[in-house]
Structure formats: C-alpha cells, structure tokens
C-alpha cells in the first residue's frame, strides 16, 4: 500500500486485483461495480489500510466458509463524500453463533478507528458486508 497512491481509483484497483488474484485458483467468480465519479478523491493512508484489511478479511472468510461461487464488490461515493465498499457472496451464510469471530471483531475495530461503520447482513443465500466511511 504505497502512500503515493492514496486515492479512491487506486484503492479500488488494488482491492479488485487482490480479490481476483486471491480467488484465481478457486471456483469463485469476482464481479465488480464502481459507482465513483471522482476516483481522484484522496484517501488517507490509515483509511486506505483499514479498508483494504477489511476487504482482505472478508475475502478470506468467503474463501474459507461461504461455499460461494460468486462474490460481488461494489464501490460507491455519494455527493456527501460518503464512501461505501460492499462485499457480497452467494454462499450459505453462517450461524448466528459464528458471528463473533476475531476477523469480524477486527473489521468492526478497523472501521471504528477511521470513524466509519461496518454492517453485516446474513442469510441462507449468502453474506453481505458494508463498510461505510466519510472521506
């Protein structure tokens, strides 16, 4: 994570490259949607690092636990400079007693550290993770 690349465009590209590389040898297909009109928008190093580590943990969980064959990554920046990264899989979801793993706790802490929010939606049709932060 080179600090000279601290903008949304480079961050999104880095996350997508990581996801595709990490899941390359699996049956999991990566689909990406970018809803960002200003990819040059600056992103602090701390925010970039924490968001990336949340994405990495999410993808690791999908690989290890989901039994998914697709993952959808959506990036959105609204007019109020609120950035959302959504990672969704079409796997089996998880039992509520599995909702307290260290990885999930770490994602919550990382988002708190940058003044953001983390939300997880779970169903038998997969898991949806939302990471939201004001830039």
Segments from the language model and where they lie:
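Glycine-rich nucleotide-binding loop
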Residues: 82, 93, 123-130
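Short beta-strand/loop element within the Bergerat-fold HATPase_c
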Residues: 70-81
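Conserved catalytic core of two-component histidine kinases
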Residues: 75-77, 120, 131
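Conserved ATP-binding N-box helix of the HATPase_c
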Residues: 48-71
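Flexible helix-coil linker/loop segments in the cytosolic histidine kinase module
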Residues: 1-10
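Helix-loop-beta hinge of the Bergerat
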Residues: 10-47
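Acidic ATP/Mg2+-coordinating residue in the GHKL
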Residues: 89
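ATP phosphate-binding glycine-rich loop and adjacent ATP-lid/helix-beta elements
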Residues: 96-125
């Amino acid at each position: 994570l080179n600090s000279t690349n601290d903008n949304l465009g480079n961050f999104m590209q880095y996350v997508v490259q990581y996801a595709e590389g990490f899941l390359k040898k699996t049956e999991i297909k990566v689909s990406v949607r970018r809803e960002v009109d200003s990819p040059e928008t600056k992103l602090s190093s701390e925010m970039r690092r924490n968001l990336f580590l949340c994405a990495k943990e999410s993808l690791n969980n999908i690989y290890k636990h989901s039994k998914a064959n697709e993952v959808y990554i959506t990036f959105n920046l609204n007019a109020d400079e609120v950035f959302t990264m959504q990672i969704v899989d079409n796997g089996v979801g998880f039992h509520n007693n599995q909702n307290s793993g260290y990885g999930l706790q770490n994602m919550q802490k990382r988002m708190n550290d940058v003044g953001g929010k983390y939300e997880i939606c779970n169903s038998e049709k997969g898991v949806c993770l939302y990471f939201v932060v004001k830039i």
